[in-house]
A protein has these predicted regions:
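A bilobed periplasmic-binding-protein/Venus flytrap-type ligand-binding module shared by bacterial periplasmic
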Residues: 1-9, 105-118
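A conserved helix-loop-strand patch within extracytoplasmic ligand-binding domains
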Residues: 1-32
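Soluble non-cytosolic domains of exported or imported proteins
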Residues: 6-9, 29-34, 56-59, 116-117, ...
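Metal- and O2-centered redox machinery and metal/ROS homeostasis
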Residues: 8, 15-18, 41-52, 73, ...
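Extracytoplasmic/secreted envelope proteins and their assembly/folding machinery
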Residues: 12, 16, 36, 40, ...
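Short amphipathic alpha-helical coupling segments at ligand-binding clamshell hinges
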Residues: 14, 117-129
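Ligand-binding pocket segment of bilobal, Venus flytrap-like solute-binding proteins
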Residues: 30-98
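C-terminal functional modules
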Residues: 133-169
Length: 169
């Protein structure tokens, strides 16, 4: 679960204590999404009697977050990394000492098993490429703001020539 940095709650358990600050609701995304199921589990596991999960959509959730940020109103949303909202605002995950949401996840590069034989340069490049969730989020924010994906990639490359050079060695 994600909150703006100005929100007082630090842990999921704190949500009960601060429920009135955000009208006792967690703004979610589409019902049935994995993060929504985990949030329902967290509400039960942390005994959050004053909290309701409100399904919506990804765009509706980020619209609610935008409004809350503009007025500095507390809000709790479901979320994940990478996502452009982390490049837009100072957000943080609430601590989850019961580990309801599990360990941090990662993104892997997957390629056809024959790629190394057919295109060794491409395979070598894919093995070297690495970028942080923050970097991905920044590119996602450009795209969300209307920059074409290829132009967003060009902008990132222009700002990070040393990184790209390492990948191309």
């Amino acid at each position: 679960l994600i909150v703006p940095d100005y929100v007082e709650a630090k842990t999921i358990a704190d949500l009960e204590k601060y429920a009135k600050d955000f009208d006792g609701k967690i703004t979610g995304i589409d019902a049935g999404a994995g993060v929504m199921r985990r949030t329902e589990e967290a509400i039960k596991e942390y005994d959050l009697k004053s909290i309701k999960l409100m399904p919506s959509s990804g765009p509706a959730m980020t619209t609610a977050l935008t409004r809350a940020e503009k007025s500095q109103k507390p809000i709790v949303v479901t979320g994940w990394i990478p996502h452009w909202m982390f490049a837009q605002w100072k957000l943080r995950f609430l601590e989850d000492p019961k580990n309801v949401f599990g360990e941090a996840e990662h993104v892997d590069t997957v390629a056809n098993p024959g790629l190394e034989a057919k295109a060794p340069e491409a395979a070598a490049f894919l093995k070297k490429i690495s970028w942080s969730a923050e970097e991905v989020g920044a590119v996602m924010l450009l795209i969300r703001d209307g920059v074409k994906p290829d132009e967003a990639a060009k902008q990132w490359i222009a700002k990070n020539p040393d990184r790209v050079a390492e990948w191309l060695k």
